């Protein structure tokens, strides 16, 4: 067996050749660039969700806050901020009127397109029922799709206690949005009540809403941007989500010996799912665990999800 020094000499000779016939080799790695992903938080609810994502240090995403309320934008942590409809609202908000939100987005369409430029995938997140998110989100989504960008809406519907008007406006906004995006993930806030304790303060309940929106975005974006045991690239995600229509989201956690299967069952039976997932045309799932997570556990979890 050759010594390590002889091995090194052999490698040098293999790649460099003799001193009299030395050649220079340039190795270009075959690396596919990661898709450029942008998240637009629209209105108050979208802006709050954006702040939650930023604090969670989600990697590989560009954050853009969009609002008619200049003061809310000032306090937002997104590096890019667009105050839409300055002539329409003078930076004072949409007053819970979706028509004003729509007009504001149309007024600022060129600025929005500049912010969208270069993206392969865009998430539009907002809370439906108010003025800016409900009115502006469909306009932004249409601009994005017209630019050839894979467009995903991740939105919430208001709590019942928020009143009839907001619920009605949310349903109208949902109808306007669903045909403007490739995939629409809808999360009814009332379903989130089942995830929290009855004594949870109102402010904390809305923080849970923000975090569910964060998980909806991160669960998909991590598939593309984070290196895992089994890698999924942007083309795989696009094949599932392009022109997919309505989508459902489930979240599950598990600990102990049966952690993977427990998490999978919890996700499949998640209260966030309004419908049974049987008959789904496609599915994306992201399994995250410690360094001791085994391939056997992943296989068991995948079987539960796909069967």
Task: State what each model feature region is.
Residues 2-307:
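Tubulin/FtsZ superfamily GTPase core signature
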């Amino acid at each position: 067996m050759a010594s390590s020094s002889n091995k090194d000499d052999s490698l040098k000779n293999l790649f460099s050749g003799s001193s009299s016939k030395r050649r220079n080799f340039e190795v270009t790695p075959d690396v596919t660039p990661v898709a450029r992903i942008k998240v637009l938080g629209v209105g108050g609810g979208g802006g709050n969700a954006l702040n939650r994502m930023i604090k969670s240090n989600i990697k590989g995403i560009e954050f853009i806050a969009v609002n008619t309320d200049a003061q809310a934008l000032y306090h937002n942590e997104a590096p890019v901020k667009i105050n839409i409809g300055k002539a329409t609202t003078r930076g004072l908000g949409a007053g819970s009127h979706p028509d004003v939100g729509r007009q504001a987005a149309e007024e600022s369409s060129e600025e929005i397109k500049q912010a969208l430029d270069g993206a392969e995938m865009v998430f539009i997140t907002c809370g439906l029922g108010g003025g800016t998110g409900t009115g502006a989100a469909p306009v932004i989504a249409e601009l994005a799709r017209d630019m050839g960008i894979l467009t995903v809406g991740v939105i919430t519907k208001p709590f019942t206690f928020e009143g009839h008007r907001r619920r009605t406006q949310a349903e109208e906004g949902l109808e306007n949005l669903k045909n403007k995006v490739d995939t629409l993930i809808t999360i009814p806030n009332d379903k989130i009540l089942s995830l929290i304790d009855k004594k949870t303060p109102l402010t904390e309940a809305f923080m849970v809403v923000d975090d569910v929106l964060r998980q909806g975005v991160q669960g998909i974006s991590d598939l593309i941007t984070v290196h895992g045991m089994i890698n999924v690239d942007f083309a795989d995600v696009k094949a599932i989500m392009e022109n997919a229509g309505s989508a459902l989201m489930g979240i599950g956690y598990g600990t102990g010996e049966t952690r993977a299967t427990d998490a999978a069952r919890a996700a499949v039976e998640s209260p966030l799912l309004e419908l049974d997932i049987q008959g789904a045309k496609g599915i994306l799932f992201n399994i995250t665990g410690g360094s001791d997570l085994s391939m056997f556990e992943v296989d068991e979890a995948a079987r539960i999800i796909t069967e």
